[in-house]
């Protein structure tokens, strides 16, 4: 639940206010409130994005329609275990085995042989978003490829290789310690971390990272960094939660971070929705500018929002 240290969380406080009556009047409306944790990937969005919701129906309407709420929070994943919760719980729109992946979302942008356009057809044709979004451009907007130095690209390729080999990127942190101290203990830790690494080491775009173990260790030492939060996407899995800063997510096969359009695909924005403003900004400008990556990362996924809105409409109509 939402409580922490035996105190009500802000969500619980809001829930209690809604249930007891909003406002100071004796006639203030009361609500039947359902606590929810809904994951966007259960509603046709190719992204692991669990979020907490409070869905409330005015009590007098709920009583007429026999609508009730569960006493505990309902998770959208519960549905796959046969728990449908209460009438206020939005049922997932996709089977667990059919949860969409990174490749479903952006495969057409980097794989010429990709013919799986089902998700794109839903986004761009069947979603009905075109009824409310005006768009005249034919070319794909917001798809400017990110520029990186050769060293950063080399590090990205190593991240991709490590992900494929099941090697933790924390080895870079160990390498930083060795570079700073020359302590052989750290060198042996690197050797241990790479003991099962397959060589020659190749990146997904067929670049040779290292021809043998010694060269692989040298490459790790060359690219050492204390930052190991960056990770490549896995093409066969949903995207991790899209956030407003793009630096930590690496393309599954190319040596770069993601474009605004690719992140927007993960969020289920149709291709004809164009993001304005600068791509990124920083410092004091963040107070006045909302860059494109922030617009994408802070949004509720449109397909998920549509499901919830339709569910509420069905409840009260």
Residue spans for each PLM region:
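Class I S-adenosyl-L-methionine
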Residues: 1-214
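C-terminal target-recognition/interaction regions appended to catalytic cores
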Residues: 122-317
